[in-house]
């Protein structure tokens, strides 16, 4: 069990404890007063809706040795035990991350920590990095949207990026399991809320930046400024930190000049002759098929033929960013190009639904599940599928409730532009009226004759598969790997992949 003197943690924030507290042993840290037990230091984290500091008295009653809260929480509570409930003025979330990291003995310093941020592509890239590193014989931990896992342990993730108390504890567990590398999906929320405070990154990837989370960030500039923080101290190491940037993205290209020579730029659009930079990685001779893409991948020193078993140019970009960062970490390009050929992909990312009877499946439409839930994500997926589709392209999608409303008509317009028919339905409506979300999407659509809408997602998927014929492709977008639907305060079982597979199986029996 981890144990540390309380005064060592308080020294980080300049708090001098009372004589009664100075030698107290702390064996746990928590942001949750209900998880507190004897030996715990409770940190009252301010939240979007509730200030966790208000629960400090409950935490002490539950056995916490001490609690640290902000001055705002103190004003609301009034009288407190000043010896055991300690108050700091500001920057709580950053300070709390440092305290937790110190408690767990700075685990990121014992790992080669790679962060992946961006609007789209994070999960595919982190899965690919984990896959390649494990194939290269490296013990690797993965933290992200789908799973948190390391040698001997795996759990379903509750957040894309955990809060600092959980994250640092899990990083320490990965160290204890002798992990050498850790791959971390880094959301914009986690940067803004300092969940990654205390993490020191060996390397970082910026995938792309397109409209999302504008219900949280005031505008795209604010969204960008939040993301860019990952690429500078105290997060990315100052001198030796490696950054890989998608040069084809206009927002990200702004960042390269700030990073000077420490960044590697990656492009699927332009070639070396158009760009002079010793850290430039690019592709030529691109070809795209139903099974993936091939290209010649160029580094500043060598080139190699590459097959990426993922559909679409956006996935080619994902792949070469992953390969570039491992190449910069001194792995062999030849080994990487060989190993990527067998990468199975990430769940719910351009995932083709298979049924048992292969002979019958040839007479059925292709059904693809993808997590695309932003305008740019949906556009790139549809553009990639459109190039390969021999028949009709049929799209099923919705937009999440209690989230950025401005993207709804944009996604409606994109679905209409690239699809032959669109089924608009529900996608985690949460507390919003599902029909109102559909109406918002319809605001972006001109030709209503191409549109069918049904707020019942099962019915929409069922009708889309019935509607589709051989050589058609049905894209079911928005939920990807998710196995639930959020309706008001209820969470019900709902898995696009299982439902689509069952409906395809039923359709096959009628053939």
From Swiss-Prot:
It is an enzyme of class 6 (ligase). Its EC number is 6.3.2.13. One of its GO terms (molecular function) is UDP-N-acetylmuramoylalanyl-D-glutamate-2,6-diaminopimelate ligase activity. This is UDP-N-acetylmuramoyl-L-alanyl-D-glutamate--2,6-diaminopimelate ligase. UDP-N-acetyl-alpha-D-muramoyl-L-alanyl-D-glutamate binds at residues 33, 160-161, 187, 193, 195. ATP binds at residues 118-124. Its cofactor is Mg(2+). GO terms for biological process: cell division; cell wall organization; peptidoglycan biosynthetic process; regulation of cell shape. Pathway: Cell wall biogenesis; peptidoglycan biosynthesis. Pfam families: Mur_ligase, Mur_ligase_C, Mur_ligase_M. A motif (Meso-diaminopimelate recognition motif) lies at residues 427-430. The gene is murE. The keyword Magnesium applies. HAMAP family: MurE. Catalyzes the addition of meso-diaminopimelic acid to the nucleotide precursor UDP-N-acetylmuramoyl-L-alanyl-D-glutamate (UMAG) in the biosynthesis of bacterial cell-wall peptidoglycan. Carboxylation is probably crucial for Mg(2+) binding and, consequently, for the gamma-phosphate positioning of ATP. It catalyses: UDP-N-acetyl-alpha-D-muramoyl-L-alanyl-D-glutamate + meso-2,6-diaminopimelate + ATP = UDP-N-acetyl-alpha-D-muramoyl-L-alanyl-gamma-D-glutamyl-meso-2,6-diaminopimelate + ADP + phosphate + H(+). Signal peptide: none annotated. The modification N6-carboxylysine is found at residue 227. It comes from the Bacteria. GO terms for cellular component: cytoplasm. The keyword Cell division applies. Meso-2,6-diaminopimelate binds at residues 403, 427-430, 478, 482. Belongs to the MurCDEF family. MurE subfamily. Keywords: ATP-binding, Cell cycle, Cell division, Cell shape, Cell wall biogenesis/degradation, Cytoplasm, Ligase, Magnesium, Nucleotide-binding, Peptidoglycan synthesis. Gene3D superfamilies: Mur ligase, C-terminal domain, Mur-like, catalytic domain, MurE/MurF, N-terminal domain.
């Amino acid at each position: 069990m981890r144990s540390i003197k309380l005064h060592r943690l308080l020294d980080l924030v300049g708090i001098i404890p009372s004589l009664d507290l100075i030698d107290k042993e702390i064996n746990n840290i928590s942001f949750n007063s209900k998880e507190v037990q004897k030996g715990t230091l409770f940190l009252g984290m301010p939240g979007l809706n509730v200030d966790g500091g208000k629960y400090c008295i409950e935490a002490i009653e539950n056995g916490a040795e001490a609690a640290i809260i902000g001055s705002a929480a103190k004003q609301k509570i009034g009288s407190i035990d000043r010896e055991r409930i300690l108050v700091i003025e500001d920057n709580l979330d950053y300070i709390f991350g440092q305290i937790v990291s110190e408690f767990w003995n700075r685990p990121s310093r014992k790992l080669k920590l790679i962060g992946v941020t961006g609007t789209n592509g994070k999960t595919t890239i982190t899965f690919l990095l984990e896959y390649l590193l494990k194939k290269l014989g490296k013990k690797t931990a993965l933290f992200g949207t789908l799973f948190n896992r390391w040698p001997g342990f795996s759990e379903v993730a509750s957040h894309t990026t955990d809060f600092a108390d959980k994250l640092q504890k899990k990083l320490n567990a990965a160290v204890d399991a002798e992990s050498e590398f850790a791959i971390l999906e880094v959301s914009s929320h986690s940067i803004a809320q300092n969940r990654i405070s205390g993490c020191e990154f060996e390397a970082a990837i910026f995938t792309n930046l397109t409209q999302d989370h504008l219900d949280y960030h005031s505008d795209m500039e604010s969204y960008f400024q939040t993301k860019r923080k990952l690429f500078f101290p105290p997060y990315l190491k100052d001198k030796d930190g490696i950054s890989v940037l998608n040069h084809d993205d206009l927002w990200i290209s702004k960042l390269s000049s700030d990073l000077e020579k420490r960044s590697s730029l990656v492009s699927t659009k332009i070639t070396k002759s158009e760009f002079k930079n010793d850290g430039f990685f690019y592709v030529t001779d691109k070809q795209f098929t139903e099974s993936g893409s091939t290209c010649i991948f160029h580094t500043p020193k060598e080139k190699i033929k590459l097959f990426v078993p993922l559909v679409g140019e956006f996935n080619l970009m994902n792949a070469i960013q992953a390969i570039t960062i491992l190449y910069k970490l001194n792995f062999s390009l030849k080994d990487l190009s060989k190993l990527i050929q067998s990468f199975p992909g990430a769940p719910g990312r351009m995932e083709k639904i298979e049924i048992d009877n292969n002979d019958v499946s040839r007479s059925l439409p292709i059904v693809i599940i993808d997590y695309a839930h932003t305008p740019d994500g949906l556009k790139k997926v549809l553009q990639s599928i459109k190039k390969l589709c021999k028949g009709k392209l049929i799209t099923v999608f919705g937009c999440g409730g209690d989230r950025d409303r401005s993207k709804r008509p944009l996604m409606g317009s994109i679905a209409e532009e690239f699809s032959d028919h669109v089924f608009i339905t529900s996608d985690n409506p949460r507390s919003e009226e599902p029909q109102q979300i559909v109406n918002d999407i319809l605001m972006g659509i001109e030709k209503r004759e191409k549109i069918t809408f049904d707020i019942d997602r099962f019915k929409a998927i069922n009708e889309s598969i019935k509607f589709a014929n051989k050589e058609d492709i049905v894209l079911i977008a928005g939920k990807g790997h998710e196995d639930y639907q959020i309706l008001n305060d209820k969470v019900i079982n709902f898995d696009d992949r299982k439902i689509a597979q069952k409906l395809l199986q039923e359709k096959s029996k009628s053939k």
